Structure formats: structure tokens, C-alpha cells
């Protein structure tokens, strides 16, 4: 099964790559410092883990702005810019409440998002 990659645009006009797999309560998997959805999905261990999560959740994966299949013209690398992309993604997907997983460098902006929007975050997990 190929990962069904889609794109959306943030309010600032950045084109962001994302994918959703599975069914159930939403879980947003925030990317590491560098991400590439197609290359991640090519790794059997990652793919197997995501499929396991997708057995119980709608898993949302995305490439950071500036990485992978997302636009590469990023100039603002602040955590606030990452929060803005996360806000735009969950708004685009119309997710009212969801769990957040912050992997590596995405930890700070997942925490910042949860602090700003506690009514939307059901759980937060940092790796």
C-alpha cells in the first residue's frame, strides 16, 4: 500500500505534504527536524509501526515546511512557525480533538500547540 500523500496550503501560502491512514480517534504525528514522507514510508519498520497505530487511530503524518515534499522556501525556522503549520493542518483537516506525538525536534512546537489549544489536544506524547 502506497501512502496517500495530499497537499494543503497554509494561510501564508506554503504548500505542505501530508497523509492520513487508518480509522479512529485522530493522532497527529509531528515530524522530526528533517522529514520526507515517501522516504519514511519506504522503511518497513516505520511503515509497520504506522500501520499498527492506524489500526486504532486516524494517523496524520506530514512533512515539515522546508523538508521532503513540502515547499522548500522556508525562511522562518522558529518553533512559532512550526506551530502555525500544525494549526493550519489540523484546521484544514477539521480535527476538533486529537492526540499529538512530538518526535525529536518537534517536541517544542507540540508542547507550544497544546499550551495554546488545550481544548483540542486529548493526549501528548514526546519521543
Regions found by a protein language model. Name each.
Residues 80-98:
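Conserved acidic catalytic loop of the alpha/beta-hydrolase fold
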Residues 7-71:
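Conserved HGGG/HGGXW glycine-rich cap/lid loop of the alpha/beta-hydrolase fold
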Residues 1-7:
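Short, hydrophobic/aromatic-rich segments at coil-to-beta transitions
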Residues 45, 49, 82-86, 101, ...:
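Generic hydrophobic, aliphatic-rich segments that mediate packing or membrane embedding
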Residues 54-57, 93-95, 117:
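A structural signal for short coil/turn segments at secondary-structure junctions
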Residues 71-83:
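Catalytic nucleophile-loop/oxyanion-hole region of alpha/beta-hydrolase
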Residues 96-127:
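Conserved hydrolase catalytic core segment
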Amino acid at each position: 500500500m502506497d501512502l496517500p500523500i495530499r497537499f494543503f496550503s497554509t494561510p501564508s501560502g506554503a504548500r505542505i505534504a501530508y497523509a492520513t491512514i487508518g480509522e479512529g480517534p485522530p493522532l497527529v504525528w509531528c515530524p522530526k527536524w528533517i522529514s520526507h514522507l515517501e522516504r519514511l514510508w519506504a522503511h518497513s519498520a516505520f511503515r509497520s509501526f504506522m500501520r499498527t497505530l492506524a489500526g486504532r487511530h486516524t494517523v496524520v503524518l506530514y512533512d515539515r515546511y522546508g523538508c521532503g515534499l513540502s515547499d522548500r522556501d522556508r525562511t522562518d525556522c522558529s518553533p512559532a512557525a512550526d506551530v502555525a503549520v500544525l494549526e493550519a493542518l489540523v484546521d484544514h483537516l477539521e480535527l476538533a480533538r486529537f492526540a499529538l506525538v512530538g518526535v525529536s525536534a518537534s517536541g517544542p512546537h507540540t508542547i507550544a500547540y497544546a499550551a495554546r489549544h488545550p481544548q483540542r489536544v486529548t493526549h501528548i506524547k514526546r519521543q
